[in-house]
């Protein structure tokens, strides 16, 4: 859990796979354009972390919002070209139940994709904030 004493954005590079392995792997990132003031910096950070650790093959697709992340991730899985998929989005709570529907649907969708046998993992990067 993140706190003022533990920043989850920091990581120990020695725990990362060797750069030779990462160099030969393919990654895909799906990023939501909604709340781009949050999601685009998330994309920049993900790209920076991947590149710093040797990744050379990263494909990025933009989707309208968080709900479409599941569709993009499934298409990446079905392409059978990627070793890992990352989804990035941000849903900000408002005064309607829309927040709950989008967050719940996206979470369940990504969880279902991760349960598929023989498919690459989908890393869940959806911020759900007040």
Across the structure, where does each feature detected by a protein language model lie?
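N-terminal amphipathic/basic leader segments beginning at the initiator methionine
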Residues: 1-23
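C-terminal binding/interaction regions
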Residues: 2-5, 25, 106-130
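Glycine-rich phosphate/diphosphate-binding loop of Rossmann-like nucleotide-binding domains
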Residues: 17-62
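Short coil/turn connectors at secondary-structure junctions
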Residues: 23-26, 55-56, 80-83, 117-123
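Short, ordered loop/turn segments at secondary-structure junctions
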Residues: 33-34, 63, 90-91, 126-130
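Active-site rim loops that border cofactor/substrate pockets in soluble metabolic enzymes
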Residues: 52-80
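Short beta-strand segments at enzyme active-site cores
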Residues: 60, 84-88, 120-128
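Glycine-rich phosphate-binding loop
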Residues: 72-110, 114
């Amino acid at each position: 859990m993140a706190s003022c004493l533990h920043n989850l954005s920091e990581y120990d590079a020695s725990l990362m796979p060797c750069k030779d392995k990462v160099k030969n792997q393919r990654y895909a990132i799906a990023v939501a354009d909604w709340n781009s003031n949050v999601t685009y910096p998330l994309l920049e950070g993900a790209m920076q972390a991947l590149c710093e650790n040797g990744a050379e093959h990263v494909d990025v697709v933009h989707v309208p919002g968080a709900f479409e992340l599941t569709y993009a991730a499934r298409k990446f899985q079905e392409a059978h070209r990627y070793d890992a998929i990352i989804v990035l989005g941000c849903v900000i709570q408002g005064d309607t139940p829309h927040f709950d529907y989008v967050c719940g649907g996206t979470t369940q969708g990504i969880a279902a994709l991760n349960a598929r046998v023989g498919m690459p993992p989908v890393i869940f990067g959806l911020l759900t904030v007040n």
